[in-house]
Amino acid sequence: MKHVYNFSAGPAMMPKAVLAQAQQELLNWQQQGTSVMEVSHRSNAFMALATQTEQDLRQLYAIPDNYKVLFLQGGAHGQFAAIPMNLIGKKGKALYLISGHWSNRSAQEARNFCEVDQLNILTQDEAGVFSVNQTDFSDIAEQYDYVHYCPNETISGVEIPDIPIVGKAVLVADMSSNILSRNIDISKFGLIYAGAQKNLGPAGITIVIIRQDLIGNAQRATPSIWNYATQVNADSMINTPPTFAWYLCSLVFKHLRAAGGLASVEQRNQQKAALLYQYLDNSHFYHNYVAPQNRSLMNVTFTTNNDELNAKFVAEAAENGLHALKGHKVVGGMRASIYNAMPLDGVEALIEFMQKFAQENR
Protein backbone atom coordinates (compact mmCIF):
# COMPACT_ATOMS: atom_id res chain seq x y z
CA MET A 1 0.00 0.00 0.00
CA LYS A 2 1.23 3.51 -0.87
CA HIS A 3 2.52 5.44 2.14
CA VAL A 4 0.05 8.15 3.10
CA TYR A 5 0.64 11.33 5.08
CA ASN A 6 -2.47 12.93 6.56
CA PHE A 7 -2.27 16.73 6.70
CA SER A 8 -5.83 17.11 7.99
CA ALA A 9 -6.52 19.95 10.42
CA GLY A 10 -8.51 17.52 12.55
CA PRO A 11 -9.25 14.77 13.16
CA ALA A 12 -5.55 14.63 12.55
CA MET A 13 -2.75 12.16 12.11
CA MET A 14 -1.93 10.11 15.21
CA PRO A 15 1.44 8.57 16.13
CA LYS A 16 1.92 5.26 14.32
CA ALA A 17 3.28 3.67 17.49
CA VAL A 18 0.10 4.61 19.35
CA LEU A 19 -2.14 3.18 16.64
CA ALA A 20 -0.07 -0.01 16.56
CA GLN A 21 -0.39 -0.48 20.32
CA ALA A 22 -4.12 0.18 20.21
CA GLN A 23 -4.45 -2.35 17.40
CA GLN A 24 -2.50 -4.94 19.38
CA GLU A 25 -4.61 -4.41 22.51
CA LEU A 26 -7.96 -3.92 20.80
CA LEU A 27 -9.44 -7.36 21.54
CA ASN A 28 -7.64 -8.08 24.79
CA TRP A 29 -6.84 -5.04 26.92
CA GLN A 30 -4.59 -5.71 29.92
CA GLN A 31 -5.16 -9.44 29.48
CA GLN A 32 -8.78 -9.07 30.54
CA GLY A 33 -10.15 -10.84 27.49
CA THR A 34 -12.20 -7.79 26.48
CA SER A 35 -11.61 -4.59 24.57
CA VAL A 36 -11.04 -1.35 26.46
CA MET A 37 -14.17 -0.15 24.64
CA GLU A 38 -16.17 -2.74 26.59
CA VAL A 39 -14.75 -2.06 30.05
CA SER A 40 -16.87 -0.17 32.57
CA HIS A 41 -15.66 3.32 33.32
CA ARG A 42 -16.28 2.46 36.98
CA SER A 43 -14.02 -0.59 36.92
CA ASN A 44 -10.77 -0.57 38.86
CA ALA A 45 -8.82 -1.05 35.63
CA PHE A 46 -10.29 1.96 33.88
CA MET A 47 -10.16 4.16 36.99
CA ALA A 48 -6.44 3.34 37.22
CA LEU A 49 -6.02 4.30 33.55
CA ALA A 50 -7.84 7.60 34.14
CA THR A 51 -5.62 8.42 37.11
CA GLN A 52 -2.44 7.58 35.21
CA THR A 53 -3.55 9.61 32.19
CA GLU A 54 -3.96 12.70 34.33
CA GLN A 55 -0.60 12.10 36.02
CA ASP A 56 1.14 11.80 32.65
CA LEU A 57 -0.41 15.05 31.42
CA ARG A 58 0.55 16.78 34.66
CA GLN A 59 4.14 15.65 34.25
CA LEU A 60 4.32 16.70 30.59
CA TYR A 61 3.17 20.23 31.41
CA ALA A 62 4.41 20.45 35.02
CA ILE A 63 0.86 21.39 36.01
CA PRO A 64 0.84 22.99 39.49
CA ASP A 65 -1.03 21.29 42.32
CA ASN A 66 -3.60 24.10 42.52
CA TYR A 67 -4.97 23.20 39.08
CA LYS A 68 -7.58 20.57 38.29
CA VAL A 69 -7.61 18.53 35.08
CA LEU A 70 -10.91 17.49 33.53
CA PHE A 71 -11.61 15.06 30.69
CA LEU A 72 -14.94 16.15 29.24
CA GLN A 73 -17.15 15.82 26.18
CA GLY A 74 -18.64 18.39 23.81
CA GLY A 75 -15.44 19.60 22.17
CA ALA A 76 -14.15 23.16 22.25
CA HIS A 77 -17.59 24.35 21.15
CA GLY A 78 -19.02 23.03 24.39
CA GLN A 79 -16.42 25.02 26.30
CA PHE A 80 -17.34 28.17 24.37
CA ALA A 81 -20.54 28.03 26.45
CA ALA A 82 -19.22 26.40 29.62
CA ILE A 83 -16.54 29.04 30.23
CA PRO A 84 -18.85 32.06 30.62
CA MET A 85 -21.34 29.96 32.58
CA ASN A 86 -18.60 29.09 35.09
CA LEU A 87 -16.34 32.16 35.12
CA ILE A 88 -18.60 35.19 34.86
CA GLY A 89 -18.85 36.84 38.25
CA LYS A 90 -19.38 40.28 39.77
CA LYS A 91 -17.93 42.20 36.82
CA GLY A 92 -20.45 40.59 34.50
CA LYS A 93 -18.40 40.76 31.33
CA ALA A 94 -15.50 39.16 29.47
CA LEU A 95 -12.91 40.38 26.98
CA TYR A 96 -12.29 38.31 23.84
CA LEU A 97 -9.13 38.95 21.85
CA ILE A 98 -9.97 38.30 18.20
CA SER A 99 -7.20 36.93 15.99
CA GLY A 100 -9.24 34.89 13.54
CA HIS A 101 -12.19 32.59 12.95
CA TRP A 102 -12.18 30.50 16.12
CA SER A 103 -11.61 33.32 18.60
CA ASN A 104 -14.55 35.07 16.95
CA ARG A 105 -16.73 31.95 17.16
CA SER A 106 -16.03 31.57 20.87
CA ALA A 107 -16.95 35.22 21.47
CA GLN A 108 -20.25 34.86 19.63
CA GLU A 109 -21.21 31.85 21.74
CA ALA A 110 -20.24 33.62 24.97
CA ARG A 111 -22.66 36.44 24.13
CA ASN A 112 -25.49 34.04 24.93
CA PHE A 113 -24.40 34.04 28.57
CA CYS A 114 -22.72 37.35 29.36
CA GLU A 115 -21.66 40.75 28.11
CA VAL A 116 -18.71 40.41 25.76
CA ASP A 117 -16.25 43.04 24.55
CA GLN A 118 -14.21 42.10 21.50
CA LEU A 119 -10.78 43.51 20.67
CA ASN A 120 -9.41 42.77 17.21
CA ILE A 121 -5.68 42.13 17.53
CA LEU A 122 -5.13 40.83 13.99
CA THR A 123 -3.73 43.32 11.48
CA GLN A 124 -3.17 43.05 7.73
CA ASP A 125 -0.70 45.20 5.81
CA GLU A 126 -0.94 46.48 2.23
CA ALA A 127 0.61 43.27 0.90
CA GLY A 128 -2.07 41.19 2.62
CA VAL A 129 0.25 39.84 5.32
CA PHE A 130 -1.36 39.09 8.70
CA SER A 131 0.28 39.74 12.06
CA VAL A 132 -0.51 40.13 15.76
CA ASN A 133 1.54 42.88 17.36
CA GLN A 134 -0.35 43.64 20.57
CA THR A 135 0.21 41.35 23.56
CA ASP A 136 -0.02 43.64 26.61
CA PHE A 137 -3.60 44.20 27.79
CA SER A 138 -2.90 44.87 31.45
CA ASP A 139 -4.33 48.39 31.25
CA ILE A 140 -7.84 47.12 30.46
CA ALA A 141 -7.94 43.45 31.45
CA GLU A 142 -8.85 43.76 35.11
CA GLN A 143 -12.28 45.25 34.41
CA TYR A 144 -13.31 41.83 33.07
CA ASP A 145 -14.01 38.51 34.76
CA TYR A 146 -11.69 36.88 32.26
CA VAL A 147 -9.74 37.50 29.05
CA HIS A 148 -10.05 34.86 26.34
CA TYR A 149 -7.78 34.24 23.36
CA CYS A 150 -6.93 31.55 20.82
CA PRO A 151 -3.14 31.17 20.55
CA ASN A 152 -3.31 29.27 17.26
CA GLU A 153 -5.85 29.95 14.53
CA THR A 154 -5.95 26.84 12.36
CA ILE A 155 -7.74 28.39 9.39
CA SER A 156 -5.35 31.25 8.68
CA GLY A 157 -2.23 29.69 10.19
CA VAL A 158 -1.71 32.55 12.65
CA GLU A 159 -0.07 31.74 15.99
CA ILE A 160 0.53 34.01 18.98
CA PRO A 161 3.75 32.70 20.57
CA ASP A 162 3.81 35.16 23.48
CA ILE A 163 1.33 34.72 26.31
CA PRO A 164 -0.81 37.88 26.59
CA ILE A 165 -0.11 40.08 29.60
CA VAL A 166 -3.34 40.62 31.53
CA GLY A 167 -2.16 41.67 34.99
CA LYS A 168 -4.22 40.00 37.71
CA ALA A 169 -7.06 39.14 35.33
CA VAL A 170 -7.97 35.53 34.55
CA LEU A 171 -6.49 34.41 31.23
CA VAL A 172 -8.38 31.73 29.28
CA ALA A 173 -6.89 29.98 26.23
CA ASP A 174 -8.38 27.79 23.52
CA MET A 175 -5.40 25.55 22.79
CA SER A 176 -7.27 23.00 20.71
CA SER A 177 -4.74 23.17 17.88
CA ASN A 178 -1.43 23.72 19.68
CA ILE A 179 -1.75 21.98 23.03
CA LEU A 180 1.37 19.92 23.85
CA SER A 181 3.20 21.38 20.84
CA ARG A 182 5.62 23.25 23.10
CA ASN A 183 6.21 23.85 26.78
CA ILE A 184 4.26 26.64 28.48
CA ASP A 185 3.95 28.08 31.98
CA ILE A 186 0.55 26.81 33.11
CA SER A 187 0.54 29.17 36.10
CA LYS A 188 0.01 32.16 33.77
CA PHE A 189 -3.43 30.84 32.83
CA GLY A 190 -6.67 30.58 34.72
CA LEU A 191 -8.08 28.02 32.32
CA ILE A 192 -6.86 26.12 29.26
CA TYR A 193 -9.11 23.97 27.12
CA ALA A 194 -8.58 21.85 24.03
CA GLY A 195 -10.42 19.41 21.84
CA ALA A 196 -8.38 16.24 21.52
CA GLN A 197 -8.52 15.64 17.79
CA LYS A 198 -5.34 17.43 16.78
CA ASN A 199 -2.54 16.69 19.25
CA LEU A 200 -4.09 14.64 22.05
CA GLY A 201 -5.99 11.76 20.48
CA PRO A 202 -9.21 11.13 18.56
CA ALA A 203 -12.26 13.35 18.48
CA GLY A 204 -14.66 12.90 21.37
CA ILE A 205 -12.81 14.08 24.44
CA THR A 206 -11.92 17.58 25.63
CA ILE A 207 -9.25 18.57 28.14
CA VAL A 208 -9.81 21.40 30.62
CA ILE A 209 -7.02 22.59 32.93
CA ILE A 210 -8.46 25.03 35.46
CA ARG A 211 -7.08 26.86 38.49
CA GLN A 212 -8.82 25.61 41.59
CA ASP A 213 -9.99 28.99 42.89
CA LEU A 214 -12.08 29.46 39.72
CA ILE A 215 -14.20 26.40 40.46
CA GLY A 216 -17.53 26.63 42.27
CA ASN A 217 -18.94 29.90 40.94
CA ALA A 218 -21.09 28.63 38.08
CA GLN A 219 -24.31 30.41 37.17
CA ARG A 220 -27.35 28.80 38.73
CA ALA A 221 -28.75 27.63 35.38
CA THR A 222 -25.51 25.91 34.34
CA PRO A 223 -26.24 22.30 33.30
CA SER A 224 -24.49 19.83 35.57
CA ILE A 225 -22.48 18.42 32.68
CA TRP A 226 -20.95 21.89 32.09
CA ASN A 227 -20.48 22.71 35.78
CA TYR A 228 -16.78 22.42 36.57
CA ALA A 229 -17.36 21.85 40.28
CA THR A 230 -19.74 18.99 39.56
CA GLN A 231 -17.31 17.42 37.12
CA VAL A 232 -14.37 17.78 39.53
CA ASN A 233 -16.36 16.06 42.27
CA ALA A 234 -17.31 13.27 39.85
CA ASP A 235 -13.76 12.78 38.50
CA SER A 236 -15.00 13.86 35.04
CA MET A 237 -17.51 11.00 35.10
CA ILE A 238 -20.85 12.60 35.87
CA ASN A 239 -22.02 10.53 32.90
CA THR A 240 -20.37 7.76 30.91
CA PRO A 241 -17.22 9.27 29.39
CA PRO A 242 -15.75 8.46 25.94
CA THR A 243 -13.62 5.66 27.33
CA PHE A 244 -11.87 4.67 24.10
CA ALA A 245 -10.84 8.27 23.37
CA TRP A 246 -9.61 8.57 26.97
CA TYR A 247 -7.57 5.39 26.53
CA LEU A 248 -6.00 6.68 23.29
CA CYS A 249 -5.08 9.96 25.00
CA SER A 250 -3.32 7.90 27.65
CA LEU A 251 -1.25 6.19 24.96
CA VAL A 252 -0.39 9.52 23.32
CA PHE A 253 0.77 11.02 26.62
CA LYS A 254 2.99 8.01 27.33
CA HIS A 255 4.35 8.20 23.80
CA LEU A 256 5.26 11.88 24.22
CA ARG A 257 6.96 11.25 27.54
CA ALA A 258 8.95 8.35 26.09
CA ALA A 259 9.98 10.54 23.14
CA GLY A 260 11.66 13.07 25.42
CA GLY A 261 8.80 15.24 26.65
CA LEU A 262 7.77 18.64 25.39
CA ALA A 263 11.28 19.99 24.92
CA SER A 264 11.88 17.33 22.28
CA VAL A 265 8.40 17.80 20.83
CA GLU A 266 8.96 21.54 20.39
CA GLN A 267 12.35 21.01 18.78
CA ARG A 268 10.86 18.63 16.21
CA ASN A 269 7.95 20.96 15.52
CA GLN A 270 10.28 23.92 15.02
CA GLN A 271 12.38 21.87 12.61
CA LYS A 272 9.40 20.76 10.52
CA ALA A 273 7.84 24.20 10.31
CA ALA A 274 11.13 25.96 9.54
CA LEU A 275 11.82 23.58 6.67
CA LEU A 276 8.42 24.16 5.08
CA TYR A 277 8.36 27.93 5.55
CA GLN A 278 11.90 28.23 4.18
CA TYR A 279 10.83 26.45 1.03
CA LEU A 280 7.71 28.61 0.69
CA ASP A 281 9.70 31.83 1.07
CA ASN A 282 12.19 30.80 -1.60
CA SER A 283 9.83 29.15 -4.07
CA HIS A 284 8.48 32.21 -5.96
CA PHE A 285 5.50 29.99 -6.85
CA TYR A 286 3.69 29.54 -3.55
CA HIS A 287 2.72 32.33 -1.17
CA ASN A 288 2.20 32.49 2.59
CA TYR A 289 0.49 35.58 4.00
CA VAL A 290 1.48 35.43 7.67
CA ALA A 291 4.28 37.50 9.20
CA PRO A 292 7.23 35.31 10.29
CA GLN A 293 6.74 36.05 14.00
CA ASN A 294 3.14 34.80 13.84
CA ARG A 295 3.52 31.78 11.58
CA SER A 296 1.92 28.71 13.07
CA LEU A 297 4.03 25.69 13.92
CA MET A 298 0.96 23.52 13.46
CA ASN A 299 -0.95 24.85 10.44
CA VAL A 300 1.02 26.11 7.45
CA THR A 301 -1.16 27.93 4.92
CA PHE A 302 -0.13 28.69 1.36
CA THR A 303 -1.57 29.34 -2.08
CA THR A 304 -0.65 29.60 -5.75
CA ASN A 305 -1.71 32.47 -7.99
CA ASN A 306 -5.16 31.11 -8.87
CA ASP A 307 -7.93 28.82 -7.66
CA GLU A 308 -7.61 26.42 -10.59
CA LEU A 309 -3.98 25.67 -9.75
CA ASN A 310 -4.89 25.29 -6.08
CA ALA A 311 -7.51 22.67 -6.91
CA LYS A 312 -5.09 20.86 -9.21
CA PHE A 313 -2.44 20.88 -6.48
CA VAL A 314 -4.79 19.35 -3.89
CA ALA A 315 -5.96 16.63 -6.30
CA GLU A 316 -2.49 15.64 -7.47
CA ALA A 317 -1.10 15.74 -3.94
CA ALA A 318 -3.75 13.24 -2.84
CA GLU A 319 -2.81 10.97 -5.75
CA ASN A 320 0.74 11.05 -4.39
CA GLY A 321 -0.24 10.07 -0.85
CA LEU A 322 -0.39 13.60 0.56
CA HIS A 323 -3.92 13.86 1.89
CA ALA A 324 -6.19 16.64 3.19
CA LEU A 325 -4.22 19.65 1.96
CA LYS A 326 -7.24 21.68 0.90
CA GLY A 327 -7.50 24.97 2.77
CA HIS A 328 -10.53 25.89 4.84
CA LYS A 329 -13.49 27.15 2.82
CA VAL A 330 -13.24 30.54 4.55
CA VAL A 331 -9.80 31.31 3.06
CA GLY A 332 -9.24 28.74 0.30
CA GLY A 333 -5.77 27.80 -0.90
CA MET A 334 -3.91 25.00 0.85
CA ARG A 335 -3.14 24.13 4.44
CA ALA A 336 -0.62 21.61 5.71
CA SER A 337 -1.38 20.70 9.30
CA ILE A 338 1.84 19.33 10.76
CA TYR A 339 0.84 18.46 14.31
CA ASN A 340 3.03 16.49 16.70
CA ALA A 341 2.37 13.16 14.98
CA MET A 342 3.51 14.35 11.55
CA PRO A 343 7.05 13.03 11.02
CA LEU A 344 9.79 15.02 9.35
CA ASP A 345 9.56 12.55 6.47
CA GLY A 346 6.02 13.78 5.77
CA VAL A 347 7.12 17.39 5.48
CA GLU A 348 10.03 16.42 3.25
CA ALA A 349 7.68 14.41 1.02
CA LEU A 350 5.36 17.41 0.77
CA ILE A 351 8.20 19.74 -0.21
CA GLU A 352 9.43 17.28 -2.83
CA PHE A 353 5.95 17.19 -4.37
CA MET A 354 5.64 20.99 -4.18
CA GLN A 355 8.91 21.37 -6.09
CA LYS A 356 7.76 18.98 -8.80
CA PHE A 357 4.35 20.63 -9.09
CA ALA A 358 5.89 24.09 -9.35
CA GLN A 359 8.26 22.99 -12.12
CA GLU A 360 5.40 21.48 -14.12
CA ASN A 361 2.99 24.40 -13.70
CA ARG A 362 5.01 27.59 -13.93
Swiss-Prot record:
Classification via Pfam families: Aminotran_5
Pathway: Amino-acid biosynthesis; L-serine biosynthesis; L-serine from 3-phospho-D-glycerate: step 2/3; Cofactor biosynthesis; pyridoxine 5'-phosphate biosynthesis; pyridoxine 5'-phosphate from D-erythrose 4-phosphate: step 3/5
EC numbers, comma separated: 2.6.1.52
Root EC class: transferase
PTM sites of type N6-(pyridoxal phosphate)lysine: K198
Gene3D superfamilies referenced in this protein's UniProt entry, alphabetically: Aspartate Aminotransferase, domain 1, Type I PLP-dependent aspartate aminotransferase-like (Major domain)
Keyword annotations: Amino-acid biosynthesis, Aminotransferase, Cytoplasm, Pyridoxal phosphate, Pyridoxine biosynthesis, Serine biosynthesis, Transferase
Annotated residues for binding of pyridoxal 5'-phosphate: W102, T154, D174, Q197, N239, T240
GO MF annotations, alphabetized: O-phospho-L-serine:2-oxoglutarate aminotransferase activity; pyridoxal phosphate binding
Annotated positions binding L-glutamate: R42
Family: Belongs to the class-V pyridoxal-phosphate-dependent aminotransferase family. SerC subfamily.
Entries under PANTHER family matching the protein: PHOSPHOSERINE AMINOTRANSFERASE (PTHR43247:SF1)
The protein, known as: Phosphoserine aminotransferase
Organism of this sequence: Haemophilus ducreyi (strain 35000HP / ATCC 700724)
